[in-house]
Amino acid sequence: MIGKEVTVQDFVLKLSEIQPEVLPVDLLCEEELPNEQETEEELDIERTVFKIVAPCGCSCCQVKLRLFVNATDSGIRTFQELLFRDLQLLCPECRGNCKHGGS
């Protein structure tokens, strides 16, 4: 550095000395883009409309909730498992009695 002010020309970076594991990356690697036909096949996933009737998750409420979803077969099975195990739907009235965030 010459002078009292630092300029960009005063900095010389030698990454190989600082971080020897840093190697240049070939951005033109051997990747291939999918064909248009493969892309169209992925978009043609068959979905079906399902009507779900489930009781309110609150123990004191007898309301039946109706929910309509558009899902794949595997998606609706996953949702069904959640409803049977970890997830409970609430009606608007019971939701108003609960605090958000699990409190």
Curated annotation (Swiss-Prot):
Protein location: Host cytoplasm; Host nucleus
Main location: host cell
Region (E7 terminal domain): 1-45
Motif (LXCXE motif): 27-31
A cellular component annotation (GO) from this entry: host cell nucleus
Lineage top rank: taxon: Viruses
Entry PTM: Highly phosphorylated.
Zinc finger feature spans (unnamed): 56-94
Chain span(s) of sequence motif Nuclear export signal: 76-84
SUPFAM superfamilies in the record: E7 C-terminal domain-like
UniProt GO BP: DNA-templated transcription; symbiont-mediated perturbation of host cell cycle G1/S transition checkpoint; symbiont-mediated suppression of host innate immune response; symbiont-mediated suppression of host type I interferon-mediated signaling pathway
Record keywords, A-Z: Activator, DNA-binding, Early protein, G1/S host cell cycle checkpoint dysregulation by virus, Host cytoplasm, Host nucleus, Host-virus interaction, Inhibition of host innate immune response by virus, Inhibition of host interferon signaling pathway by virus, Interferon antiviral system evasion, Metal-binding, Modulation of host cell cycle by virus, Oncogene, Transcription, Transcription regulation, Viral immunoevasion, Zinc, Zinc-finger
Any matching Pfam family: E7
Gene Ontology molecular function, alphabetical: DNA binding; DNA-binding transcription factor activity; protein domain specific binding; zinc ion binding
Comment text on domains: The E7 terminal domain is an intrinsically disordered domain, whose flexibility and conformational transitions confer target adaptability to the oncoprotein. It allows adaptation to a variety of protein targets and exposes the PEST degradation sequence that regulates its turnover in the cell.
Similarity-based family: Belongs to the papillomaviridae E7 protein family.
Function: Plays a role in viral genome replication by driving entry of quiescent cells into the cell cycle. Stimulation of progression from G1 to S phase allows the virus to efficiently use the cellular DNA replicating machinery to achieve viral genome replication. E7 protein has both transforming and trans-activating activities. Induces the disassembly of the E2F1 transcription factor from RB1, with subsequent transcriptional activation of E2F1-regulated S-phase genes. Interferes with host histone deacetylation mediated by HDAC1 and HDAC2, leading to transcription activation.
Quaternary state and interactors: Homodimer. Homooligomer. Interacts with host RB1; this interaction induces dissociation of RB1-E2F1 complex thereby disrupting RB1 activity. Interacts with host EP300; this interaction represses EP300 transcriptional activity. Interacts with protein E2; this interaction inhibits E7 oncogenic activity. Interacts with host TMEM173/STING; this interaction impairs the ability of TMEM173/STING to sense cytosolic DNA and promote the production of type I interferon (IFN-alpha and IFN-beta).
Protein name: Protein E7
Annotated source species: Human papillomavirus type 8
